[in-house]
């Protein structure tokens, strides 16, 4: 699980990341958190995960990214609310 800190809400990040994740064939989810951060899980090819992280860095002002292991397996990618 990734937690993105910075200017990450109110900029269309979830919708744009959803589209990119679907096009890359990744599974997982993305959602806004109450504290102003964005939480995301990406599962799939490691190079594609690196690519989507770089994509997010290009469309949002990221101050910090935290990473935590997530053992849950996902079958598709979705926006959570």
From Swiss-Prot:
Keywords: Hydrolase
Origin: domain of life: Archaea
Assigned EC number: 3.6.1.7
Enzyme class, spelled out: hydrolase
Catalytic residues in the record: 14, 32
TM annotation in the entry: none
Gene3D superfamilies hit by this protein: 3.30.70.100
Catalytic activity line of the entry: an acyl phosphate + H2O = a carboxylate + phosphate + H(+)
One Pfam entry name: Acylphosphatase
GO molecular function: acylphosphatase activity
The keyword Hydrolase is annotated on this UniProt entry: yes
Residues covered by the Acylphosphatase-like domain: 1-81
Entry's family note: Belongs to the acylphosphatase family.
Protein's UniProt name: Acylphosphatase
Gene: acyP
